[in-house]
Amino acid sequence: MKRLLIIFVVAVSACKPPTPAEQMDSIQSWLATAELVGEAWLRHTTPDKYSRQTLELSRETLLQISSDLLKSPPHSVDSASLDSILTRSRVSVAQMARLIQAKDAPDFGRQLDSLRADQKLVKQLSDSIESRQ
Protein backbone atom coordinates (compact mmCIF):
# COMPACT_ATOMS: atom_id res chain seq x y z
CA MET A 1 0.00 0.00 0.00
CA LYS A 2 2.82 2.40 0.88
CA ARG A 3 4.46 1.65 -2.42
CA LEU A 4 1.29 2.59 -4.34
CA LEU A 5 1.00 5.83 -2.39
CA ILE A 6 4.60 6.73 -3.18
CA ILE A 7 4.09 5.94 -6.86
CA PHE A 8 0.93 8.05 -6.90
CA VAL A 9 2.65 11.03 -5.25
CA VAL A 10 5.58 10.81 -7.66
CA ALA A 11 3.24 10.53 -10.65
CA VAL A 12 1.16 13.52 -9.56
CA SER A 13 4.29 15.58 -8.92
CA ALA A 14 5.71 14.68 -12.31
CA CYS A 15 2.52 15.82 -14.05
CA LYS A 16 2.56 19.25 -12.45
CA PRO A 17 3.49 21.89 -15.02
CA PRO A 18 6.62 23.92 -14.28
CA THR A 19 6.22 27.29 -12.61
CA PRO A 20 7.26 30.45 -14.47
CA ALA A 21 10.35 30.62 -12.24
CA GLU A 22 11.28 27.06 -13.20
CA GLN A 23 10.71 27.86 -16.87
CA MET A 24 12.94 30.92 -16.58
CA ASP A 25 15.62 28.78 -14.90
CA SER A 26 15.46 26.38 -17.86
CA ILE A 27 15.71 29.28 -20.30
CA GLN A 28 18.77 30.61 -18.46
CA SER A 29 20.33 27.15 -18.54
CA TRP A 30 19.84 26.77 -22.30
CA LEU A 31 21.19 30.27 -22.93
CA ALA A 32 24.25 29.39 -20.84
CA THR A 33 24.65 26.20 -22.86
CA ALA A 34 24.63 28.23 -26.08
CA GLU A 35 27.16 30.65 -24.60
CA LEU A 36 29.52 27.88 -23.49
CA VAL A 37 29.32 26.10 -26.83
CA GLY A 38 29.92 29.41 -28.58
CA GLU A 39 32.99 30.14 -26.49
CA ALA A 40 34.31 26.63 -27.12
CA TRP A 41 33.76 26.96 -30.87
CA LEU A 42 35.63 30.27 -30.94
CA ARG A 43 38.54 28.57 -29.11
CA HIS A 44 38.41 25.69 -31.65
CA THR A 45 37.85 23.14 -28.87
CA THR A 46 34.60 21.66 -30.20
CA PRO A 47 33.86 20.31 -33.68
CA ASP A 48 31.70 22.44 -35.96
CA LYS A 49 29.02 19.77 -36.26
CA TYR A 50 28.69 19.30 -32.49
CA SER A 51 28.60 23.06 -31.89
CA ARG A 52 26.02 23.66 -34.61
CA GLN A 53 23.79 20.79 -33.46
CA THR A 54 23.97 21.92 -29.84
CA LEU A 55 23.01 25.46 -30.83
CA GLU A 56 20.13 24.15 -32.94
CA LEU A 57 18.89 22.05 -30.02
CA SER A 58 19.23 25.07 -27.73
CA ARG A 59 17.16 27.20 -30.10
CA GLU A 60 14.45 24.54 -30.45
CA THR A 61 14.25 24.01 -26.70
CA LEU A 62 14.19 27.75 -26.04
CA LEU A 63 11.33 28.06 -28.51
CA GLN A 64 9.32 25.36 -26.75
CA ILE A 65 9.91 26.69 -23.23
CA SER A 66 9.23 30.28 -24.34
CA SER A 67 6.01 29.27 -26.06
CA ASP A 68 4.82 27.45 -22.96
CA LEU A 69 5.79 30.35 -20.71
CA LEU A 70 4.06 32.95 -22.86
CA LYS A 71 0.81 30.97 -22.97
CA SER A 72 0.38 31.99 -19.36
CA PRO A 73 2.93 34.74 -18.73
CA PRO A 74 3.84 35.73 -15.19
CA HIS A 75 1.97 38.79 -13.96
CA SER A 76 5.12 40.36 -12.54
CA VAL A 77 6.70 41.15 -15.93
CA ASP A 78 5.61 42.80 -19.15
CA SER A 79 4.83 39.90 -21.49
CA ALA A 80 5.72 41.93 -24.61
CA SER A 81 9.18 42.68 -23.20
CA LEU A 82 9.65 39.08 -22.18
CA ASP A 83 8.61 37.86 -25.64
CA SER A 84 10.94 40.36 -27.31
CA ILE A 85 13.97 39.33 -25.26
CA LEU A 86 13.31 35.62 -25.69
CA THR A 87 12.76 36.01 -29.44
CA ARG A 88 15.95 38.03 -29.81
CA SER A 89 17.87 35.37 -27.86
CA ARG A 90 16.56 32.57 -30.07
CA VAL A 91 17.46 34.55 -33.19
CA SER A 92 21.00 35.05 -31.86
CA VAL A 93 21.38 31.33 -31.17
CA ALA A 94 20.03 30.45 -34.63
CA GLN A 95 22.36 32.97 -36.25
CA MET A 96 25.31 31.53 -34.31
CA ALA A 97 24.52 28.08 -35.73
CA ARG A 98 24.45 29.52 -39.27
CA LEU A 99 27.72 31.37 -38.71
CA ILE A 100 29.41 28.12 -37.71
CA GLN A 101 28.37 26.70 -41.08
CA ALA A 102 29.87 29.79 -42.73
CA LYS A 103 32.95 29.63 -40.47
CA ASP A 104 32.50 33.34 -39.75
CA ALA A 105 34.18 33.81 -36.37
CA PRO A 106 34.04 37.65 -36.28
CA ASP A 107 30.26 37.80 -36.80
CA PHE A 108 29.86 34.80 -34.51
CA GLY A 109 31.65 36.73 -31.75
CA ARG A 110 29.28 39.67 -32.22
CA GLN A 111 26.25 37.37 -31.98
CA LEU A 112 27.72 35.79 -28.86
CA ASP A 113 28.09 39.26 -27.32
CA SER A 114 24.46 39.99 -28.17
CA LEU A 115 23.41 36.72 -26.56
CA ARG A 116 25.34 37.61 -23.40
CA ALA A 117 23.54 40.96 -23.19
CA ASP A 118 20.20 39.18 -23.54
CA GLN A 119 21.23 36.67 -20.86
CA LYS A 120 21.61 39.54 -18.40
CA LEU A 121 18.13 40.80 -19.22
CA VAL A 122 16.66 37.31 -18.89
CA LYS A 123 18.38 36.98 -15.50
CA GLN A 124 16.83 40.27 -14.34
CA LEU A 125 13.38 39.15 -15.46
CA SER A 126 13.88 35.78 -13.83
CA ASP A 127 14.88 37.41 -10.55
CA SER A 128 11.80 39.61 -10.75
CA ILE A 129 9.54 36.61 -11.30
CA GLU A 130 11.17 34.64 -8.51
CA SER A 131 10.92 37.47 -5.99
CA ARG A 132 7.18 37.80 -6.59
CA GLN A 133 6.28 34.15 -6.25
Please provide the spans of the model-predicted regions.
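Alpha-helical transmembrane segments
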Residues: 1-5, 24-27
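Sec-dependent N-terminal signal peptides
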Residues: 4-13
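Bacterial signal peptide processing site
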Residues: 14-18
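Alpha-helical segments in soluble extracytoplasmic regions
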Residues: 22-95, 110-114
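Extracytosolic low-complexity repeat regions of secreted or lipid-anchored proteins
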Residues: 86-128
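Juxtamembrane amphipathic/coiled-coil helical coupling segments that flank
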Residues: 130-133
